[in-house]
């Protein structure tokens, strides 16, 4: 049987737009786990907090479920898919209204041994 060398964590329906989340994910893709956590700590962005939590969850999954060592882990895959959009309306002049889309994101982080 093949040795499992990667672990995954997901955060679903996060109230940050996918476009803004992808900007932060691009910073950590391919980095060592310790470096990625340091980058996220100093990124002043709402998405960075969510991604940091998801990354820590993926690390915990790797250590507890698959017995991998944190020192050997690398962020191998990260992606942000679009979640359900909350549609709202903003009242405007003369009784009209403008649509507002409050976008959500499904964040996925995969860590693997290098």
UniProtKB/Swiss-Prot annotation:
Top-rank taxon, per record: Bacteria
Any Pfam family the entry gives: Ribosomal_L22
GO terms (BP aspect): translation
InterPro entries named in the record: Ribosomal_uL22, Ribosomal_uL22_bac/chlpt-type, Ribosomal_uL22_bac/org-type, Ribosomal_uL22_CS, Ribosomal_uL22_sf
Paired cysteines (S-S): none
Keyword annotations of the record: Ribonucleoprotein, Ribosomal protein, RNA-binding, rRNA-binding
GO molecular function: rRNA binding; structural constituent of ribosome
CDD domains given in the database record: Ribosomal_L22
GO cellular component, one term: cytosolic large ribosomal subunit
HAMAP family per the UniProt record, alphabetical: Ribosomal_uL22_B (MF_01331_B)
Family note: Belongs to the universal ribosomal protein uL22 family.
Quaternary structure annotation from Swiss-Prot or TrEMBL: Part of the 50S ribosomal subunit.
Protein task: This protein binds specifically to 23S rRNA; its binding is stimulated by other ribosomal proteins, e.g. L4, L17, and L20. It is important during the early stages of 50S assembly. It makes multiple contacts with different domains of the 23S rRNA in the assembled 50S subunit and ribosome.
Protein name: Large ribosomal subunit protein uL22
Organism from which the protein derives: Streptococcus pyogenes serotype M6 (strain ATCC BAA-946 / MGAS10394)
């Amino acid at each position: 049987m093949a040795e499992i060398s990667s672990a995954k964590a997901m955060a679903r329906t996060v109230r940050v737009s996918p476009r803004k989340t992808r900007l932060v994910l691009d910073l950590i893709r391919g980095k060592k786990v310790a470096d990625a956590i340091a980058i996220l700590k100093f990124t002043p962005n709402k998405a960075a907090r969510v991604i940091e939590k998801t990354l820590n969850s993926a690390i915990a999954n790797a250590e507890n479920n698959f017995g991998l060592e944190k020192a050997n882990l690398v962020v191998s895959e990260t992606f942000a898919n679009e979640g359900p959009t909350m549609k709202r309306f903003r009242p405007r002049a003369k009784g009209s209204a403008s649509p507002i889309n409050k976008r959500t994101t499904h964040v996925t982080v995969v860590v693997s041994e290098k």
